[in-house]
């Protein structure tokens, strides 16, 4: 697929494979993203299954494939700072400032109670508490099967107040 650029106000939205799009962009101040964790791989291999599989959808194997190392190399080379949700699933250097989202939910059979973000920042680990409906976005339009709450993303942006350009390659 050929990369396509769409301008929305003073923002650019690129539609295409991040391996093709990132080299076209100037370096950015922050990559804030929630890369695919490989849930699709788990479903294909008979992972969680059950209600979780129905919730995520049968086609997760098509869109939720763990990114290759070259994608992370592109991101590191194209950005000053990074925040990767699900960073504990990827082969990247250890973080010196992990972030945690406590979903404020009782134990769920097949969903995590919290999620970790890998960051390029240094300092103490920090936690954000936001109630989610069964681990998913509460009281917000759920436009994506693994959507993060807007307040969580706003909190993430607070760690890079000087960032003028933010990229989400996924």
Which functions belong to the PLM regions below?
Residues 1-32, 162-163:
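SAM-dependent nucleic-acid methyltransferase catalytic core
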Residues 16, 66-67:
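Short coil/turn linker and secondary-structure boundary residues
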Residues 24-33, 37, 41-61, 67, ...:
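Class I S-adenosyl-L-methionine
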Residues 70:
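Surface-exposed ligand/attachment interfaces on beta-rich extracellular proteins
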């Amino acid at each position: 697929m050929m990369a396509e650029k769409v301008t929305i106000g003073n923002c650019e939205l690129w539609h295409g494979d991040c391996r093709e799009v990132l080299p076209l962009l100037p370096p950015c101040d922050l990559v804030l993203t929630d890369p695919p964790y490989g849930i699709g791989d788990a479903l294909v291999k008979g992972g969680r299954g059950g209600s979780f599989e129905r919730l995520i959808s049968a086609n997760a194997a098509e869109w939720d494939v763990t990114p290759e190392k070259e994608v992370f190399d592109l991101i590191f080379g194209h950005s000053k700072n990074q925040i990767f949700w699900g960073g504990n699933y990827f082969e990247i250097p250890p973080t010196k400032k992990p972030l945690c989202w406590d979903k404020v939910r009782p134990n769920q059979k097949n969903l995590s109670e919290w999620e970790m973000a890998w960051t390029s920042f240094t300092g103490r680990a920090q936690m954000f508490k936001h109630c989610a409906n069964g681990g998913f976005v509460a009281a917000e339009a759920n436009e994506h099967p693994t959507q993060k709450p807007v307040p969580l993303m706003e909190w993430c942006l607070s760690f890079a107040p000087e960032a003028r350009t933010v990229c989400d390659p996924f």
